[in-house]
Amino acid sequence: MKILITGRPGVGKTTLIKKLSRLLQNAGGFYTEEMREGEKRIGFKIITLDGEEGILARTDLPSPYRVGKYYVNLKDLEEIGVRSLERAFQEKDLIIVDEIGKMELLSRKFREVVEKIFDSEKDVIATIKKSSDPFVEKIKNRNDVVIFELNEKNRNSLLNEILSVLKFNRGEKQ
């Protein structure tokens, strides 16, 4: 089963992904987390479910790749994030991707591994931006994808809804 979680920035997509990854067995992949200095967001970390960390983007990073005010670190994205997805593809039942967004899509290797996991029989839970990017649209428009939109009203109930759908689907496979 392929599950996409979308919603406006700051609504809680990463929080939901982290809760799901703790509750579900045999999961691999990564999530992103804000980096702050005081009240100011200065970048994003990439953290694998195995605990490996790297820098996805920072405001002061020497990089030719930029999204808004953030300079994207393709090296850590590919060596930590992409590698965690490849490892999860080989070893796990469930693959977590937070997120399929502008920064991550700068990497050809990231796009290739996302296509590979979505074309596989593996269960996938990913967060995805509301975007008009052709790659994002291709993923969203797949027949095997279920999209959940997270908002303030369903923030507390969506966790159980996704768990129920996933467990029901896994039960049908057996």
From Swiss-Prot:
Superkingdom of this protein's organism: Bacteria
SUPFAM superfamilies hit by this protein: P-loop containing nucleoside triphosphate hydrolases
EC number(s) stated in the UniProt entry for this protein: 3.6.1.15
- Which reactions appear under catalytic activity for this entry? a ribonucleoside 5'-triphosphate + H2O = a ribonucleoside 5'-diphosphate + phosphate + H(+)
Instruction: Show the Pfam families listed in the entry.
Output: NTPase_1 (PF03266)
SMART domains hit by this protein: AAA (SM00382)
Binding residues annotated for ATP, in chain numbering: 7-14, 94-101
Query: Which GO-annotated molecular functions does the record name?
Result: ATP binding; ATP hydrolysis activity
Which CDD domains does the annotation name?
A: RecA-like_Thep1
Q: What class of enzyme is it?
A: hydrolase
Its family?
Belongs to the THEP1 NTPase family.
Role noted for this protein: Has nucleotide phosphatase activity towards ATP, GTP, CTP, TTP and UTP. May hydrolyze nucleoside diphosphates with lower efficiency.
- Kindly provide the name given to this protein in its UniProt entry: Nucleoside-triphosphatase THEP1
Lineage per the UniProt record: Bacteria, Thermotogati, Thermotogota, Thermotogae, Thermotogales
